[in-house]
């Protein structure tokens, strides 16, 4: 057992491998309890504030359902539902909400915002996504890998393919080195991963037995991998010029059936944090088709819908792992 009561959950950098495994074990146990109808509520009477400066499907639903399952009440503060950063500073917001709520989730922009909330709130603060990191997603990813592979995380070979500069590349690398994994970022040289973070992760890897490889060579990067992972290439609201340059650079890095074959591993799996641009069935998908002539972006539709894809198991596990974070840091033990 680990006492994580009142701890903030801002980045996996703040946790030991044993503590991360504790979150994963707790999530597994909570998932089993939910499935069997034996869940014990450990957050009765708790009040939780959910601050979303960016829209969300999985993260919001995971926090709301997880809290409800555990007997807590939530207040959702959407992109237009609070004054944070506009009329009121993050520090002031934290001191107000910390007097009314038992825990605060933040999904938004800079990592410094969630860190400021944590500094001033006086209650546990959880990072639901920032521009630099996405730690709750990594717990869901690792729980899903545990469920699909009969070997420990430190024997997993894992490649993140695509935009090496985005928050998922950062977050996965942090989690992977903590857990001793063979981790590769396969990305064009023109989109480099943060050098300071890479250096820090290599220091951790030296202690945990992990391996970190940054390469633009797809064949070399995915060889022998158990998991191929990708994320969207561009974010909504970025200018057309960014879309054009990113698409040109990243189209060769689309994860497809051929790339799965390149792993040489018949048991390889495909993962994605979602949403994914794999067809023309969305407004964005249609716009991409009209502007750039592409029916699929970071992943082929064929692979997304194939037996190799475990993206919906991964999405479900967002709820179980987020619930574990809340129970571990706020629940009655």
Swiss-Prot record:
Q: Which reaction does it catalyse?
A: carbamoyl phosphate + L-ornithine = L-citrulline + phosphate + H(+)
- A GO CC term attached to the entry: cytoplasm
The entry marks the following residues as binding carbamoyl phosphate, namely 56-59, 107, 134-137, 273-274, 318
- Which Gene3D superfamilies would you find in this protein's record? Aspartate/ornithine carbamoyltransferase
Keyword line: Arginine metabolism, Cytoplasm, Transferase
Give the binding site residues for L-ornithine: 167, 231, 235-236
**Quick one: which pathway?**
Amino-acid degradation; L-arginine degradation via ADI pathway; carbamoyl phosphate from L-arginine: step 2/2
What enzyme category does the UniProt record give?
transferase
- GO molecular function terms noted in the UniProt entry: amino acid binding; ornithine carbamoyltransferase activity
State if Magnesium is listed as a keyword. no
Pfam families with a match to the protein in the record: OTCace, OTCace_N
Q: What does this protein do?
A: Reversibly catalyzes the transfer of the carbamoyl group from carbamoyl phosphate (CP) to the N(epsilon) atom of ornithine (ORN) to produce L-citrulline.
Family indicated by similarity: Belongs to the aspartate/ornithine carbamoyltransferase superfamily. OTCase family.
> Which named protein is this?
Ornithine carbamoyltransferase
**Can you name the source organism?**
Clostridium botulinum (strain Okra / Type B1)
Q: Which gene encodes it?
A: arcB
């Amino acid at each position: 057992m680990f006492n994580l009561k009142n701890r903030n959950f801002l980045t996996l950098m703040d946790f030991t491998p044993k503590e991360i495994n504790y979150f994963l074990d707790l999530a597994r146990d909570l998932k089993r309890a939910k499935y069997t109808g034996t869940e014990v509520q450990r957050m009765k009477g708790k009040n939780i504030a959910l601050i979303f400066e960016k829209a969300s499907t999985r993260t919001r639903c995971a926090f709301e359902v997880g809290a409800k399952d555990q007997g807590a009440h939530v207040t959702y503060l959407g992109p237009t539902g609070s004054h944070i950063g506009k009329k009121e500073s993050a520090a002031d917001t934290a001191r107000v909400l910390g007097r009314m709520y038992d825990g605060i989730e933040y999904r938004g922009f800079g990592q410094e915002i969630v860190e400021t909330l944590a500094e001033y709130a006086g209650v546990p603060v959880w990072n639901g996504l920032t521009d630099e990191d996405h730690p709750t997603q990594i717990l869901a990813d690792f729980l899903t890998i545990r469920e699909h592979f009969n070997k420990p995380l430190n024997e997993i070979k894992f490649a993140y393919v695509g935009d090496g500069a985005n928050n998922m590349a950062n977050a996965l690398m942090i989690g992977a080195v903590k857990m001793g994994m063979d981790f590769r970022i396969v990305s064009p040289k023109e989109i480099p991963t943060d050098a300071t973070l890479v250096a820090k992760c290599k220091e951790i890897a030296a202690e945990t037995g992990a391996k970190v490889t940054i390469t633009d060579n797809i064949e070399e990067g995915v060889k022998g991998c158990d998991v191929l992972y990708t994320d969207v290439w561009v974010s909504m609201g970025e200018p057309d010029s960014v879309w054009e340059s990113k698409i040109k650079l990243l189209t060769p890095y689309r994860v497809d059936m051929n790339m799965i074959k390149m792993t040489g591993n018949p048991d390889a799996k495909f993962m994605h944090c979602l949403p994914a641009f794999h067809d023309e069935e969305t407004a964005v998908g249609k716009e991409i088709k009209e502007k750039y002539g592409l029916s699929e972006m970071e992943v082929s539709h064929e692979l997304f819908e194939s037996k190799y894809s475990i993206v919906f198991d991964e999405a479900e596990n967002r709820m179980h792992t987020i619930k574990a974070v809340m129970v571990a840091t706020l629940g009655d033990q």
